Amino acid sequence: MTVGFPPAEGHGAATGRRALRRSGGGWAFVVGLLCAALAFAVLQPGTAAAQTASFANTKMPKADPNKKMLVTADELVYDYEHDKISAVGNVQIYYDGSTLEAKRVTFDRKANTLRAEGDVLLKQPDGKILTANTMQLTEDFRDGFLESLRVDTPDKTHFAATRADRTDGNITVFQNGVYTACEPCKDHPEKPVLWQIKAARIIHNQNEQMIYYKDATLEFFGLPFAYFPYFSSPDPTVKRKTGFLMPEFYNNSMLGIGAGVPFFWNIAPDRDLTFDPLYFSKQGLLAKGEWRQRLIDGSYNIRAAGIQQQDIEQFAGLPGYRENRGMVQSSGNFVINSQWQWGWDGTLTSDRTFLRDYGLIGAAETEKISQAYLTGQGDRSFFDVRGMYFLGLSVTDNQDLIPVVGTFNYNYVFGNPIFGGEAGVKVNFNSVSRTEADFVGTSAATSWVGGATGIPPGSCLLSNPNPTQCLLRGAPGDYQRLSGEFYWKKTLTDAAGQMWTPFASARVDVAHANISALPTNYTDGPTLAGQNVLQSGNDDLIRAMPVIGLDYRYPFISVENWGTQTIEPRAQLIIRPNETSIGKFPNEDAQSLVFDDANLFSVSKYSGWDRVEGGSRLNVGVTYTAALNGAGVISAVVGQSYSLFGKNSFAYGDMANTGLESGLETSTSDYVARFSYSPTNNLEFISRFRFDEENYTLQRLELEGRTSIDRLSLSATYGRYEPQPLLGYYQEREGVLTTASYKLTDVWSVSGGIRYNIAQASIDMTTAAITYADDCFTLALTYLSDYSINGPNNGPNNTVMLTIGLRTLGETKVKSAIGSSTQ
């Protein structure tokens, strides 16, 4: 049944009150609204019609079609005497995206107000849900007051108050208000939530998107924790808002106790500024801040910090022994188009330990890389060019030994097959500049054990290095190299299932080396077998390396009742000439040679472009894989490499002795193997081995295991490596790294890790943490002790950090250095 409103006065006035009732399952009526009306339109005198969904024979403005209203109720009551209309029983009003539910809703046509009573619920278009005992609102829902109110937002924040008043469609004042971002306990909703803020008044300014609290108390589990006469925070819908952030606290023996309150300035939607001053009781005010801006094609930021230290004696004998200290950092990334982007990342400091001393970097950071870059990514190509400056952050770093580097890399795979196979090109350019030679000792007597000056003692002093006791990690002077390689390969499978992959490549390297004067006792002194000592002076270099080869694989597959197994023997024959100019090309990027199963079948096993493998070689091995029904997967690899004829590149060291003592320097290499077993998706064991080819003694061993069982996660890594004095490892290295985490409950977890140096019988890294995290609150206490930052003679770097986060309000950190200094 569709019903229209009767006139406010007229021939029906003899009956002061009339009720229309129904006995069926519900009725609905739709009425047109005036542009600003909320509930019911005010009718002009006339006769009401009941045949249509809109008013007829009335004089009223045209209703906004976007603000129609649907009302359902058990009964509609007209009060002509007081000019009121009431909907009674299971009332539901749908208007402009909002839904109002109540036991009774009364519209006062004179005052243009609406009063809802009894289990009132208002759902707003933005997802907010308001509940109250009573609501009195203006006709457009803009203003009004509510009693015994509760507001639930879509992002699970909640307000409650004994009364709330809304004015100007903007400001809502909650009397005796409560705010929380925590959900009540499902089983015991009567229990206090984890945290909540109670205030005499909570004021929400919707236009400012701010919430103001007056006479506020922060409670945890219903118990008062902190009192604030006044504070404010952005409302939960705001991601960026001008105002103060959560405070920060520090404690450090050299700096004293530190505290600060950052201020965030939301200048515009595309830019902001954070001013974050910290005052330290021993050193004074550290001024720091960050500017961020997003442009149409990217974004950038600038960070700066500076301090005039009040007590420089705390840093006596250290890089921080100066009055004025500071830094500037900046990074940016910009998109040129869908394939190209460019950017930078730069750091400039007054001294190398400023960032660590004042907690401006992570505990494990040992260097900062300043770089500018341009990269491109296509369907079959990759382009990258960048310049890099490495800033050492340790007390023992000598910046003159650290290079400035420029690199260029380009890879392209041809779209159309060439002779039926895949072909492509690789290009690399590298430029290295260094002020002083970087010598490293090959024994305990000549090794650099650290020190404030950063100059190695003993036989590896820059003025008197002995090539039989020292190797050159970095060449002084300037070095540029351009390399290009063309490659081709094609895989053929015959009727028997054998896989044949012929391949070929051609590479050319051209370089210019301007090596600063090296000590004559290094360049002219006695050398070890296989050493090729770098010489001083200018040199233009060129070398070429053509390669042809054949890769053969023959997989055998067996399907059994217990599972499926695959055995695949593999052989790789490589024919090429000898490597030329060994030792004349400074080796800057190919020093990290580790011979294992990962590079057993690599055509060139060097890690970079400064060395190229020469001489003909045969690589052989067998791979075994078994998928056990219900019992996991086993995988194993074993292999060996043979130098067939020509010069074995790995038997000839360069300035860093790369290749010597690698297991590849003899005509028959060491054996390499890998074995792994995964009984389930949550449990895995991996082992890697290298055995001497003559006596089968273990040269290199790595064992790793990791598992995740319900709430428990464990991992352990064990490594043992025989001495390689010609590479600077003059002692046996052996250690264990273990990590564990356990989820005590859905919200509580603990984690920790230990690195134990077996060779030195000492723990050199320890970490532990306990964390609480739920839907509204985070608490983390973390401890880290690490010797690797300061060096073994300077003691560990011990740090404790407490992090507390209240969802929607922010996060604060308390960081303290304990024990030895943070140097």
Where in the sequence are the language-model features?
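Immediate N-terminus of the mature polypeptide
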Residues: 3, 50-51, 78, 256, ...
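Local alpha-helix boundary/kink/capping signal
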Residues: 13-14, 43-45, 508, 575
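N-terminal targeting/secretion presequences
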Residues: 2-7, 11, 19-20, 42-59, ...
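Bacterial N-terminal signal peptides
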Residues: 16, 21-44
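Outer-membrane beta-barrel proteins and related beta-barrel translocases across Gram-negative bacteria
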Residues: 134-137, 141-145, 152-173, 177-186, ...
